[in-house]
Regions:
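Glycine-rich phosphate-binding loop of ATP-dependent small-molecule kinases
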Residues: 1-166
């Protein structure tokens, strides 16, 4: 269960190194070095690969459109998934990639939440990295925290073990 907002946000904030093509994300998967462009007043990531010699990471062509180029495919996938859920006699495994903010304190530990990064420049002109849990609005309009891959994978393993009676 991954909301379209999650896909949209991940695509729109994706960047790549123009030299080695390594992908990162300006909000969700940053590099060691962050830069600031005085002309555009924007922050950018600097590639971590030594061979790239400090290349400035750039937005992939078309990513500014978010999910629009793949919306029909996502809708078709959703329709197929809903149809599959109607099958009887077949055990189901349900995975959630987010947890409502209101429930998070009772159900998750902080390290299970996807970190989101923002940046600001302090008085000494140094870039300050701010880390907070990434909040998304799920498809039901509920403000939620996105989960890291490990807790989702653990849920998958536990449910499969239960279904297989292991």
């Amino acid at each position: 269960d991954v909301g379209v907002h999650v896909f949209d946000e991940r695509i729109k904030t994706r960047v790549i190194c123009p030299v080695c093509k390594t992908p990162r994300n300006i909000r969700l998967a940053i590099t060691k070095e962050i830069g600031y462009d005085e002309n555009t007043k924007t922050f950018y990531l600097v590639c971590d690969e030594a061979a790239c010699k400090g290349a400035r990471m750039v937005t992939k062509e078309g990513d500014e459109l978010g999910i629009e180029p793949i919306r029909k495919r996502l809708e078709a996938d959703d329709m197929i998934a809903k149809h599959l859920l109607k099958l009887k006699g077949v055990p189901h495994v349900f995975l959630r990639n987010s947890v409502p903010v209101a429930e998070a304190k009772n159900t998750t530990d902080e390290y299970e939440l996807t970190p989101a990064y923002s940046f600001e420049i302090d008085e000494a002109k140094k870039i300050k990295i701010i880390e907070t849990p990434w909040t998304v609005t799920d498809d039901d309009g509920v403000e939620s925290y996105s989960l890291m891959p490990a807790p989702v994978a653990l849920s998958l393993i536990k449910q499969i073990a239960k279904v297989l009676k292991l």
